[in-house]
Amino acid sequence: MKKQLQRKVDQVATLTDKFKMAKTIVMFEYKGLSVANLTSLRSELHKENIDLKVYKNNITRRAAINAGFDALEPSLTGPLAVAISYDDVVAPAKIINEFAKKNKTVVITSGVIEAKVADQVAIMALANLPSRETLLTQLAAGLLMPVKEIAIGLNMLLETKE
């Protein structure tokens, strides 16, 4: 019995450390998902250096409290999988959201974004953000538009003087 208790204590300590180091944590229900589908999601997430694991809710609850994420406690019900990203803030939410569109049994419940507890709405908002490249393109276009307008105006002024 002592070995089993020690193993659980070790799991809580390990998960607490992961929670503290994570940039993003996404928790989702996987009820009714086949092993093959869960494995394919795991491999997709692994390509982006994102850990996916299923923990018992009691272990997840204790680790969340130890990491200072007490507000997660009410959402820790039912079969949950935990995706943890240490590098990219947006990737786990995007990948799981895309996967959930194909597999209706997957439901994002809550998570943590840069050390702040986030509900389903916040995680979905993060998942629906355009990619970094798209945002940079939009920013560049927005910055260049006034310059373009000035150039067109100057050209028109030069043409009227000629």
Curated annotation (Swiss-Prot):
What biological-process terms (Gene Ontology) are attached? translation
- Tell whether Amino-acid biosynthesis is among the UniProt keywords: no
State the SUPFAM superfamilies in the record: Ribosomal protein L10-like
Asked whether the UniProt record includes rRNA-binding among its keywords, one would answer yes
Any idea which GO molecular function terms this record carries? large ribosomal subunit rRNA binding; structural constituent of ribosome
Function summary: Forms part of the ribosomal stalk, playing a central role in the interaction of the ribosome with GTP-bound translation factors.
The protein's assembly and partners? Part of the ribosomal stalk of the 50S ribosomal subunit. The N-terminus interacts with L11 and the large rRNA to form the base of the stalk. The C-terminus forms an elongated spine to which L12 dimers bind in a sequential fashion forming a multimeric L10(L12)X complex.
Q: HAMAP family recorded for this chain?
A: Ribosomal_uL10
Q: Which family does it belong to?
A: Belongs to the universal ribosomal protein uL10 family.
Its recorded name reads Large ribosomal subunit protein uL10
